[in-house]
A protein has these predicted regions:
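Core catalytic alpha/beta fold that binds nucleotide/phospho-ligands
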Residues: 1-187
């Protein structure tokens, strides 16, 4: 089970509060009452719902808040599509990722590819619970057709990661990505 809930901000409403409110709404739909009272935190601060086999993750960017519920550990990210900055690409992206981002097309195409990779990276580090304690240069994404493939990078080589899946959705100038364990039964 993977369920996405998102809301576009209509006023100056606080996006973080909107994301937590989406969690309340999503949990109610799944029969979980008072989810904020059931939250515990992992070693790197990732919040979990205690005792019901339901996992969640929150994100927000620009005018959107996102909440994802899943029956496996999940990470999500929503990012407004933005122009890539050379300093960010040079510092946080692998050579293959840089080539993918800059491989031609219009400025808008490059912005979409940059934002896609950034959202994939964020969803992965949120799924593992490591967050930004994990160096974004310690892994990279490549693509088989349009499917993202995750590789861990180390001094001893490159290792393809199996067991994870990525769900991507474009949303009104935003990239939305969810990372979850493949044992998921349905979307």
């Amino acid at each position: 089970m993977l369920k996405l809930f998102y809301k576009k901000r209509e006023t100056d409403e606080d996006l973080s509060r909107m994301a937590w409110d989406l969690l309340e709404t999503a949990c109610l739909k799944e029969g979980v009452l008072h989810p904020r009272d059931r939250i515990i935190y992992g070693k790197n601060g990732k919040p979990y719902l205690e005792g019901n086999g339901l996992y969640f993750n929150l994100s927000h960017s620009g005018d959107y808040a996102l909440c994802v519920l899943c029956d496996t550990e999940v990470g999500c990210d929503i990012q407004r599509v933005r122009k890539p900055r050379a300093s960010v690409i040079d510092h946080w992206f692998s050579t293959k990722e840089k080539d993918y981002i800059l491989c031609g097309g219009s400025e808008g195409d490059r912005a979409e590819r940059f934002t896609r990779i950034w959202a994939l990276k964020e969803s992965y580090i949120k799924q593992t619970g490591e967050g930004l304690s994990r160096d974004l240069r310690s892994f990279c994404f490549a693509f088989e057709g349009e499917e993202p493939v995750l590789y861990l990078l180390s001094d001893s080589g490159t290792e393809r990661v199996s067991g994870l899946a990525f769900y991507e959705q474009k949303l009104d100038g935003y990239a939305c990505v969810c990372c979850f364990k493949k044992q998921l039964t349905s979307l």
